[in-house]
Swiss-Prot record:
Extent of Polar residues compositional bias: 80-89, 127-146
UniProt signal peptide: 1-36
Activity regulation summary: Glucan synthesis by GTF-S is independent of primer glucan unlike GTF-I.
Free-text function comment from the UniProt entry: Production of extracellular glucans, that are thought to play a key role in the development of the dental plaque because of their ability to adhere to smooth surfaces and mediate the aggregation of bacterial cells and food debris.
Keyword Repeat: yes
Organism: Streptococcus downei (Streptococcus sobrinus)
Family: Belongs to the glycosyl hydrolase 70 family.
Any one GO biological process: glucan biosynthetic process
Enzyme class of the recorded protein, top EC level: transferase
Name of the molecule in the record: Glucosyltransferase-S
Alphabetically ordered keywords of this record: Dental caries, Glycosyltransferase, Repeat, Signal, Transferase
Lineage of source species: Bacteria, Bacillati, Bacillota, Bacilli, Lactobacillales
Catalytic reaction equation(s): [(1->6)-alpha-D-glucosyl](n) + sucrose = [(1->6)-alpha-D-glucosyl](n+1) + D-fructose
Positions annotated as Cell wall-binding repeat: 146-166, 168-187, 1052-1071, 1073-1092, 1093-1112, 1113-1133, 1136-1159, 1160-1179, 1234-1253, 1278-1298, 1299-1318, 1343-1362
NCBIfam families registered for this protein in UniProt: glucan_65_rpt, KxYKxGKxW
Length: 1365
């Protein structure tokens, strides 16, 4: 059976979870009989197969001696189940792309299954009649069928099933005798291997003797860490010169391992067929073809002739590489790759490295995963959001929990901050500050190390100026990161991600999907309407970034417009894809209602740039197009954003008042800044105050028209003052007026004697064009000088509270510019390089008010193309993090261009931020064998994955680079300068960083893992369970390679009888011990004494299953009469618990694993759901099943029982629980259904008067208290919000009581009816006759807004009470 494990979302207990999905062909062993599918020709050719997975297996209630299985086979072959499926060529038996359906072929003989590491067959099994089996997790007996029978034709015996078909590749016990029916002919064979005879494969010949290795030393082989791989070549004893005569090999005469030896017969057949297609030989071959050996010898002869003709073996290396990649065991097909939209890792899959005696060079005492800010100690500390991040992000994942690595990270940070001095000999070319990349994906100890280094080197904790001059910002997406930053002395600016998300919803979406503007006033770290004087955690905010709201939108275009439906925009894409997508993207940029490009970017900047208590980061791609040459093409929004930036310098200061003015169908978000020196509306201020300040009015609906006037209090400092527009939305776009001279005085508006600035309803209306979809108005006082600057310089006064950053006017005065796009074009001439252009434009950026310039990562990019970053070469995918345009130019220019850019910006008074990327290294040049397990991004093992603590060749070694030159180089000096950095114990490890080892070369012991590389699960070659290895003390070579020349010839080989058991001698006469062995296409295991295994056998930590004839069961089901066990393609049972999806004959089918190796079959109760699983363990959906004469119908979606003709069909093992209807349960005790409040199994539950359990609803207990019972189990709950069965909401307080009436919860006023159901999107009359309205989304009571209720308009005042217009 072949299997491809994939993952998809599946609804389990009302939650969508990622579950393993496997493409399979099933074999089933029941009561001593094995059923499997005869699905391929074992030669890589396709065959047509009948679909034989029974949807409604029938069992004889009195089945004995195999009749249970026989009856099942008849059901399996019913006419309505027959369908054909094209099976792809068999290439790798352990994991293949074939979709081969289950049928009547025994997995006991795996001759038709080309595995490299075998699975298991049935041993001696105890059968039990179906009538004796329980229904909970076991097959359910049903109606009887006529069994099949033996027949003899021409002296040959066959087994014919009830449909008259001969079973092939099938073994069963009949009247106490074991039969095996040949996989090709169906002819009955002896149940045990014949002994005392030499196997035909063991006849010695000149090929066998001469193809042995020249020596068993590593010098005769190409290896990785002494392991042989599918790409390994070796030096044979002799070479068949020109395909004619054997001659002694020379040192340079290397040949592919796979020309002489193959891990199994099926691969050998595939090899022969590969060369047949190449024209070296003719014919088609199967793994049991009698002429297969002759074919491979003819191939060898033909290869040698072509080598002689070509004069080299380069062509052969190319062809052998093609062959290797065509085999699923040596390709990504066996690595459980996941694709959009169900990826479990950004590169399709991750590998976790683990310790093993077989790869001791890669062992580590660390690898503490997921120690991000939320889980730095290993336990969750912050709970603002459920998202905390994950460890395995991209490529080779650096183990940042290792103290040696942590010291290296400090070394690299020091190098990065002093790059100008170290590399260029120019201190003026040093970076000033830092952005830390992917904070949620690294060990948070690095953040403390960076913080402490900045404190020691720059004195960032000493005063505000030092801190701002050496700014630190975090790419910190989790809402928990803000809490972490606060606890760590406000050492850096974190993202106000909730505010960013709110802006996207309110501004960026297409008009039909935009959110409510009012939410922006309260979203994120600061409530700007209710608590304007609060000081949130120091933060920054943006609407877009180089990797946010660009590449995801491009990916959407690629999927929807270019027809690549599985494109995630990150992998498997080309520059041509990107160029085509950008043509569509840029066209959409100029559309009125944009589909792909974000809408209303000027509106977002108008909001961000005037907000208090946050730092705005401007994105390059909002000023200039994301693609194209650097700064060559302005966006339609350039003028508006530039005006807002320059106007910010002149006007944005003082306190802030934010409000939302609800009108008829929509509302206006307003914000007032009072001017420098005025923190509130009552502050009179001074001349500078009067000439500064700002009013902002925004609506985000394209068809908005106000129906009433609006007045803003500009503050006492602005009484009787003229105001003019800075920005106005018009039907043609956005009009900008930077200076007073740009405005016609007729456009002035005047405040009254109280400082109120009024707008008539006719002035408040939206427009729709490419620049704005809604309304933007920005007003500023008349009278400011053109060069007015109201920003505040940072203080040099000593900081005393221990915090590094503080919310202050000086911090508010900062503007960060993210000065690059992922997608800017490659320079065509030196003057087009990004850094060359930046160096010339310092004054422009200064005029915008930019104070901090965030540079692109300056590392020379890897070009391996495995991820977007290594396609567009943006600097985030690199192999050498010390190489900042030093080995060659990077995408942004030369090292001199970088130095010039830094100096040019600094000369304009702008600080320069480097990009610290501590998490990953791509495509290192050196290979290394590691012990790897296929995992998801969190490091959780993938159920059923073939790569499971398996030797794997990773690209984890570096050499000959700047890492060798600079790795660890500065640690000794740093210890002298800042000794406390080396004595501080880190939070995740409890240990200080370790400078004793200087990492000049990377290797696997310093990594947590890697992405899957497409080499395949079995790229490191093995024979059975033993890997081909040349290390001292671990030497293992297959017989055909092992140099035994000159040793005495063996007198016997093959199966032998010995000490009451069956043993096996290989071609050299050596007894096979303690390993799996493929013999004539089937797999066997011989223990440490050489005895052939039968039955259940524990090997290492896993239990396998072997037939009485020693053949192994893999990818099959064994039914022992009581329980059913699933054996995967490795022959192992699964101990995971839960649903796993299998792909069977083009259909998705589900099994349930119990956690002990068994699977559910029959009628089963799971989480109060009644489900049915057929004899193969597949869940029945959308069908009616007859069990013991009673009918059960299961729905087509989730497979729950929906109808039964049995009055009490509760599954066995559920005590008094009774199914009363569609997912309605009762509990029967002493013959009576319980009612009211009850305690069962320690849980409080409640039953209605009719006995039906309350689930997802409320009920009043005996003491008159309203309680809630959850919708899954029906258990009484504690404090919190809960969803009811009809998707309403209730709230339970600390006492377990369901709240009713008007309540205040978490600062919101909400209402619950007398059943506890929250009012949402409805008006409610309270007991005093007052009308209140509660929002449809949040349920919060409306205040200060108009609302249409049942066709009438009401105004809900500050207390939430309604008045008519």
């Amino acid at each position: 059976m072949e299997k491809n494990l994939r993952y998809k979302l599946h609804k389990v207990k009302k939650q969508w979870v990622a579950i393993g999905v496997t493409t399979v062909t099933l074999s089933f062993l029941a009561g001593g009989q094995v059923v499997a599918a005869d699905t391929n020709n074992n030669d890589g050719t396709s065959v047509q197969v009948n679909k034989m997975v029974p949807s409604d297996p029938k069992f004889d209630a009195q089945a004995q001696n195999g009749q249970l299985a026989q009856a099942m086979f008849k059901a399996a072959n019913q006419a309505d189940q027959t369908a054909t499926s094209q099976v792809s060529p068999a290439t790798d038996g352990r994991v293949d792309n074939q979709v081969t359906p289950a049928a009547n072929q025994p997995a006991a003989n795996v001759a038709n299954q080309d595995v490299a590491n075998p699975a298991t067959d049935a041993g001696a099994l105890n059968r039990q009649s179906a009538a004796d089996t329980s229904t909970d997790g076991k097959a359910v007996p049903q109606t009887s069928d006529q069994p099949g029978h033996l027949e003899t034709v021409d002296g040959k015996t066959y087994y014919v099933d009830a449909n008259g078909q001969r079973l092939k590749n099938y073994s069963m016990v009949i009247d106490g005798k074991t039969y095996y029916f040949d996989g090709q002919t169906g002819e009955a064979q002896t149940d045990l291997p014949k002994t005392g005879q030499a196997n035909q494969d063991n006849v010695p010949d000149s090929y066998q003797a001469n193809n042995q290795a020249y020596s068993n030393e590593a010098s005769s082989f190409e290896t990785v860490d002494n392991y042989l791989t599918a790409d390994s070549w070796y030096r044979p004893r002799k070479i068949l010169k020109n395909g004619q005569s054997w001659q002694a090999s020379s040192e340079g005469d290397l040949r592919p391992i796979l020309m002489t030896w193959w891990p199994d017969a099926a691969t050998k057949a595939a090899y022969a067929n590969f060369w047949a297609k190449e024209g070296l030989i003719s014919g088609s071959y199967r793994q049991n073809s009698a002429n297969l050996d002759a074919a491979t010898q003819n191939i060898q002869s033909a290869i040698e002739k072509k080598i002689a003709s070509e004069g080299n073996t380069n062509w052969l290396r190319d062809k052998m590489s093609q062959f290797v990649k065509s085999q699923n065991q040596w390709s990504i097909a066996s690595e459980n790759e996941t694709v959009y939209p169900n990826q479990d890792h950004m590169q399709g899959g991750a590998l976790l490295f683990s310790n093993s005696k077989d790869t001791e060079h890669a062992n580590s005492d660390w690898r503490l995963l997921n120690r991000n800010p939320t889980f730095q100690t290993g336990k969750q500390k912050y709970f603002t959001t459920n998202y905390a991040g994950y460890e395995l992000l991209l490529a080779n994942d650096v183990d940042n929990s290792n103290p040696v690595v942590q010291a290296e990270q400090l070394n690299h940070l020091h190098y990065l901050m002093n790059w100008g001095d170290i590399v260029m000999g120019d201190k003026d070319a040093n970076f000033d500050g830092v952005r830390v990349d992917a904070v949620d994906n690294v060990n948070a100890d690095l953040l403390q190390i960076q913080r402490d280094y900045y404190k020691a080197k720059y004195g960032t904790d000493q005063n505000e100026k030092n801190a701002i001059d050496h700014l630190s910002i975090l790419e910190a997406w989790s809402g928990n990161d803000n809490d972490y930053v606060k606890d760590q002395n406000n050492f850096s600016l974190s993202i106000d991600n909730d505010q960013r998300s709110g802006m996207l919803k309110a501004f960026g979406y297409a008009s039909a999907y935009r959110g409510n503007l009012s939410n922006l006033a309260t979203a994120g770290l600061k409530n700007r309407s209710a608590n304007p004087d609060s000081d949130p955690v120091p933060n920054y905010v943006f609407i877009r970034a180089h990797d946010s709201e660009v590449q995801t939108r491009i990916a959407k275009i690629i999927r929807e417009k270019l027809g690549k439906t599985n494109a995630d925009g990150l992998t498997n894409l080309t520059l041509d894809d990107l160029n085509k997508a950008f043509d569509i993207y840029n066209q959409d940029m100029n559309a009125t209602d944009k589909v792909y490009y974000p809408n209303n970017l000027p509106m977002a900047y108008a909001w961000m740039l005037q907000n208090k208590d946050t730092v705005t980061r401007v994105y390059y791609g909002d000023m200039y197009t994301d693609n194209g040459q650097y700064m060559a093409t302005k966006t339609p929004f350039y003028n508006a954003i530039e005006t807002l930036l320059k106007g910010r310098i002149k006007y944005v200061a003082g306190g802030q008042a934010v409000s939302y003015k609800q009108d008829w169908s929509s509302g206006i978000l307003t914000s007032v800044r009072y001017g420098k020196g005025a923190n509130s509306a009552s502050d009179a201020g001074n001349t500078e105050t009067r000439n500064s300040g700002m009013a902002l009015l925004i609506n985000n609906r394209p068809n908005f028209r106000a129906y009433r006037n609006l007045t803003l209090n500009m503050g006492a400092a602005h009484k009787s003052q003229a105001y003019r527009p800075l920005l106005l939305s018009t039907k043609d776009g956005i009009a900008t007026y930077l200076n007073d001279s740009d405005v016609d005085s007729r456009q002035y508006k005047y405040t009254d004697s109280q400082g109120n600035l009024s707008f008539s309803a006719s002035e408040l209306q939206s427009v729709a064009n490419a620049q704005v979809s809604g309304m933007i108005q920005v007003w500023v006082p008349v009278g400011a000088a053109d060069n007015q600057d109201v920003r505040t310089s940072p203080s040099t006064q000593a900081t005393k509270d221990g915090n590094i950053y503080h919310q202050s006017d000086a911090l508010d005065s900062q503007v960060i510019y993210e000065g690059f796009s992922n997608f800017q074009a490659f320079a065509q001439s030196p003057d087009q390089y990004t850094n060359a252009v930046i160096a010339k434009n310092g004054d422009l950026f200064k005029s915008w008010g930019i104070t901090q310039f965030e540079m692109a990562p300056q590392y020379v990019s890897s070009e391996d193309g495995t991820f977007l970053d290594s396609v567009i070469l943006n600097g985030y995918a690199f192999s050498d993090r010390y190489d900042l345009a030093m080995s060659k130019n990077n995408k942004y220019g030369s090292k001199q261009d970088l130095a010039n850019a830094i100096k040019g910006l600094q000369s304009a008074g702008i600080k320069v931020l480097s990009d610290l990327v501590p998490n990953q290294l791509y495509n290192l040049p050196g290979k290394e064998v590691v012990t790897a397990t296929r995992v998801n991004q969190y490091g959780q093992a993938k159920s059923g994955a073939t790569i499971n603590k398996t030797p794997y060749v990773a690209n984890t070694r570096s050499y000959g680079d700047y890492q060798e030159q600079y790795g660890g180089k500065f640690l000794d000096d740093l210890q002298k300068l800042y000794p406390r950095l080396f004595s501080t114990k880190q939070i995740s490890t409890g240990k200080p960083i370790d400078p004793s080892v200087k990492i000049t070369n990377w290797s696997a012991k310093y990594f947590n893992g890697s992405n899957i590389l497409g080499r395949g699960a079995k790229y490191v070659l093995s024979e059975g369970n033993k890997y081909l290895n040349l290390a001292d003390g671990k030497l293992f070579l297959p017989t055909v390679l092992n140099n035994t020349y000159g040793q005495p010839q063996v007198s016997a080989n093959g199966f032998i009888s010995k000490n009451g058991g069956i043993h096996y001698l290989d071609k050299n006469g050596q007894e096979v011990k303690n390993r799996f062995k493929e013999i004539s296409g089937s797999w066997y295991y011989f223990d440490s004494d050489g005895k052939m295994a039968t039955g259940k056998t524990k090997i290492g930590n896993d239990t396998y299953l072997f037939m009485p004839n020693g053949k192994q069961l893999k990818e099959g089901v064994w039914y022992d009469g009581k329980k059913a066990y699933y054996y995967d393609d490795n022959g192992r049972t699964w101990t995971n618990k839960g649903f796993v999806e299998f792909r069977v004959d083009g259909q998705d089918k589900w099994r349930y694993f119990n956690g002990d190796g068994t699977i559910a079959i029959g009628l089963v109760s799971l989480d109060n759901r009644t489900l049915y699983f057929d004899a193969y363990g597949y869940q029945v959906k959308g069908q009616t099943v007859t069990i013991n004469g009673k009918s059960y119908t299961f729905d087509a979606d989730q497979g729950d029982l929906v109808q039964t003709d049995n009055a009490n069909p509760a599954p066995q093992g559920q005590a008094g629980w009774k199914l009363l209807g569609d997912n309605q349960w009762g509990y029967r005790k002493d013959g009576q259904l319980l009612t009211g409040e009850q305690t069962i199994d320690g849980q409080k539950v409640f039953f209605q008067d009719n006995g039906v359990q309350v689930k997802g609803g409320t009920a009043t207990d005996a003491s008159g208290v309203l309680r809630f019972y959850d919708r899954d189990q029906g258990h009484q709950v504690g404090k919190g919000w809960y969803s009811t069965s009809d998707d309403n909401w209730v709230y339970v307080n600390e006492s377990g009581q369901v709240l009713t009436g008007l309540q205040t919860i978490d600062g919101q006023t909400v209402y619950f009816d007398d059943k506890g159901i929250q009012a949402k999107g409805k008006a409610v009359w309270d007991e005093n006759g007052n009308l209140r309205y509660f929002d449809a989304d949040s349920g919060n009571m409306l205040r200060d807004r108009w609302k249409n209720v049942d066709g009438n308009w009401y105004y809900f005042n500050r207390n939430g009470l309604a008045t008519r217009w």
